[in-house]
Curated annotation (Swiss-Prot):
One of its GO terms (molecular function) is DNA-binding transcription factor activity. It comes from the Bacteria. Residues 28-157 form the HTH marR-type domain. Residues 71-94 bind DNA. The gene is ydgJ. Gene3D superfamilies: Winged helix-like DNA-binding domain superfamily/Winged helix DNA-binding domain (1.10.10.10). Keywords: DNA-binding, Transcription, Transcription regulation. Pfam families: MarR (PF01047). This is Uncharacterized HTH-type transcriptional regulator YdgJ.
Amino acid sequence: MTCQSLIYQLIVLTGKKGWVLASFCSEEAEILYQLQGVNKVIGVKFEACTGISQSRLELLTLLYHADEISQSDLQKKVNIDSAAVTRHLKQLESKGMVSRRRKPEDNRITLVRLTDQGRERIESSKKEKERFMKEMLANVSAEERRLLIDVLARMRNNINNIEA
């Protein structure tokens, strides 16, 4: 759905043509709408293509580069809330991809490590992830990719600086 079709629907629903045009027809609104659309579909398509969610793959990748790490340190590195990390790790553990144990010196700390099966999953996911990214960025030139990276980084910085 484009901004224009969204505007039409809002005009029909609200009967407020002037407000809708001012609020939803701006270039900024179209950018926000497109970003939200990409955000909605990218996770679903990524998981369908790779067989694993981006969050779980990120956790496995971090563990791939660490021998063993505390669950709280892992949570800080991925910037996902602790309950979500726990859920992800429980599912990964049930699939044999990670193992968790209590730290002997401090039973409050849970240590996490990648299993051999998890290591194999990371290695097999690399090709799937590369294929997904290649298809996602088809018809986007190298120059456009560099520009997109720059623009998104600046937008992320701007968003982080917004006072709530």
